[in-house]
């Protein structure tokens, strides 16, 4: 995990005699965020079987995907610094937060500032940058000083689910946060260790940067397509995901929304000795509602999430008509509560092209997570 290091400068002599009255000049260092999906999706299912997402993922990832979805498949690195907030509660560890005494954004991994004596709460999160423009993530620091909320706004895409919201929401960028309460910065230097090489007093804090966003890779396998579905419009939606996240606690909000994300169709992909067409996508979410997956290591437990989760998209048939496909992925999302690969399979020999634009209702057979078959209404 990632540690936040608070180091206070001083001399080799008695530290009480060499600190500024009323406070001290301090250095804060935060390690950069680097992870791969193997550590991000650290599930351990029944009988000690670990989650092997690469064995399931057939869509692949090429340069066009990196450009379309805004990043590499199996690597994330935050290089845009951090946002840090600090709250001095005086000598009362239960005092409420006021306007932050420390309010800064750093471009690198460290900064120096002066801390007053007292009991501090510290919050840090990675500075979100979107190369395409303004970030979709919004940060609410004004509703309350007790915690900070991350959220996104609505797009122009209309959706069928989660009234009263009639439009889909933007997916957030990758977001991590760390929160440490009751850091005692005092003149006695209790808990500090002298770093003789650098000649500084160091207070090491067990402060973990944890994800508050979770990635789902979606793939729809089209068997026996033979050109029946010729293209897609590049949009996709997943419903029932949390609209917000609490950066202090790591818990997602209770408000379910539908997220918009991009999708792409690849043709003639070899999979288990068969040539198939695959529609792939990647969506970043705040996870399922009222949940913090970081509190326990993933064990494949279905959390008590009352919301239904659907993936839907429009597909264009070779006769020029389109149809809206809707997949119930509730069981899969609850099973993979920290994100993962969602695979859906369609046998196109069982599906007739719609006779008019806008599609028509029919049943499609889709493979379940446990490899049984069941029907969903389209």
Annotate each PLM feature:
Residues 65-136, 229-334:
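Tryptophan-paired
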Residues 1-2:
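Sec-dependent signal peptide recognition
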Residues 22-27, 114-118, 199-201, 208-212, ...:
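Solvent-exposed loop and beta-edge segments used for protein-protein assembly and interaction
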Residues 169-170, 174-271:
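A sequence/structural signal for flexible, mid-protein segments enriched
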Residues 7-10:
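C-terminal motif of bacterial Sec signal peptides marking the signal peptidase cleavage site
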Residues 89-210:
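Short, low-hydrophobicity acidic/polar segments
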Residues 12-145, 336-378:
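Acidic/polar, low-complexity intrinsically disordered N-terminal segments immediately downstream
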